[in-house]
Curated annotation (Swiss-Prot):
GO terms for molecular function: rRNA binding; structural constituent of ribosome. Gene3D superfamilies: 3.30.1370.30, 3.30.1490.10. It comes from Helicosporidium sp. subsp. Simulium jonesii (Green alga). One of the primary rRNA binding proteins, it binds directly to 16S rRNA central domain where it helps coordinate assembly of the platform of the 30S subunit. The lineage of its organism: Eukaryota, Viridiplantae, Chlorophyta, core chlorophytes, Trebouxiophyceae. It is found in: Plastid. This is Small ribosomal subunit protein uS8c. SUPFAM superfamilies: Ribosomal protein S8. The keyword Transport does not apply. One of its GO terms (cellular component) is ribonucleoprotein complex. Part of the 30S ribosomal subunit. Keywords: Plastid, Ribonucleoprotein, Ribosomal protein, RNA-binding, rRNA-binding.
């Protein structure tokens, strides 16, 4: 079992995207649970189910389809981990990046919990920059 469950969840999500899987099972942790809530809020998945105290099942992943030329706002192409256990990345509210001219988003861990960069900018709070999602 890996020590960094969040990185493991992102890797499983990336691998599912590469093979166009609609369902992925990620390890359960409080961070991954909050992360799956954000994916639901951003309409990047349709349903999540807690399988046991160890796993969360994410269903109905929406991703970019290479065969069609259509890209919708809620289809994502790539997710990338920014802050790592060996190299934490903290930013102020004014330094929160815009990803793909506002089409992508970042996820921050703040004192108010996990939230997207847009929400953190609105509340004027910074935090640890966990990951980013690209749509282009």
């Amino acid at each position: 079992m890996p020590r960094d469950l969040f990185s493991d969840a992102l890797t499983r999500l990336r691998n599912a995207l590469r093979v166009n899987k609609q369902t992925v099972i990620i390890p359960f942790s409080n961070l991954n649970y909050s992360f799956s809530n954000i994916l639901l809020e951003e309409h990047l998945l349709e349903k999540k189910t807690i399988l046991s105290k160890k796993y969360i099942k994410l269903e109905g992943l929406k991703f970019y389809n290479k065969k069609s030329d259509h890209t919708l706002f809620n289809f994502f192409k790539n997710c990338q981990r920014l802050s790592k256990p060996s190299n934490r990345l903290y930013i102020k509210a004014g330094d929160i990046p815009l990803i793909d001219n506002g089409l992508g988003f970042v996820i921050l861990s703040t004192s108010y919990g996990l939230m997207t960069g847009k929400k953190a900018r609105a509340l004027n709070i910074g935090g640890e920059l966990l990951c980013q999602f690209n749509f282009q």
